């Protein structure tokens, strides 16, 4: 059983997945920092010194300056600023993944076209019915004519 697990774990796909998860986690941290430390402070500056990370509405009694004060007083809060930060974070990650997948698909389409060209070169028309057949065929599958050996 250990041997089977070892073979499974050492397959290329599992290792590729592990590397992808690690890089994805690191990328997520970078994007979160970008949103929280660069983008949202600039947006807040444009909106009149607003700090989105501390934007909230209390759902109970009391007036609090920060989310931490409200939570310490056990007053429920609607933290819309943190939600906006997370939405921007998600949009950046989703757009980045979209661009990466789009490039991968574009690369795969080019590869498929090359394979199709190679397949086209592997065919020839039947001299009797003109249907495309494999270039090494000795009999046409469409009209069943016997062909000359290649």
Swiss-Prot record:
It is found in: Cell membrane. The chain crosses the membrane at residues 14-34, 81-101. It is a multi-pass membrane protein. Belongs to the MscL family. SUPFAM superfamilies: Gated mechanosensitive channel. Channel that opens in response to stretch forces in the membrane lipid bilayer. May participate in the regulation of osmotic pressure changes within the cell. GO terms for molecular function: mechanosensitive monoatomic ion channel activity. Homopentamer. Keywords: Cell membrane, Ion channel, Ion transport, Membrane, Transmembrane, Transmembrane helix, Transport. Pfam families: MscL. Disulfide bonds: none annotated. The keyword Transport applies. Signal peptide: none annotated. PANTHER family: LARGE-CONDUCTANCE MECHANOSENSITIVE CHANNEL (PTHR30266:SF2), MECHANOSENSITIVE CHANNEL MSCL (PTHR30266). This is Large-conductance mechanosensitive channel. It comes from Desulfitobacterium hafniense (strain Y51). Its main location: membrane. GO terms for cellular component: plasma membrane.
């Amino acid at each position: 059983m250990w041997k089977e697990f070892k073979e499974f774990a050492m397959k290329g796909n599992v290792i590729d997945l592990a590397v992808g998860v690690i890089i994805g986690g690191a990328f997520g941290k970078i994007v979160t920092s970008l949103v929280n430390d660069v983008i949202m402070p600039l947006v807040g500056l444009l909106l009149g010194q607003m700090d989105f990370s501390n934007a909230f509405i209390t759902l109970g009694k009391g007036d609090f300056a920060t989310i931490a004060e409200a939570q310490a007083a056990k007053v429920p809060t609607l933290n819309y600023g943190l939600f906006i930060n997370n939405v921007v974070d998600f949009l950046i990650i989703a757009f980045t993944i979209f661009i990466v997948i789009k490039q991968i698909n574009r690369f795969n389409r080019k590869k498929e076209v090359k394979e199709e060209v190679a397949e086209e070169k592997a065919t020839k028309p039947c001299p009797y019915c003109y249907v495309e057949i494999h270039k090494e065929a000795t009999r046409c599958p469409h009209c069943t004519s016997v062909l000359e050996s290649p």
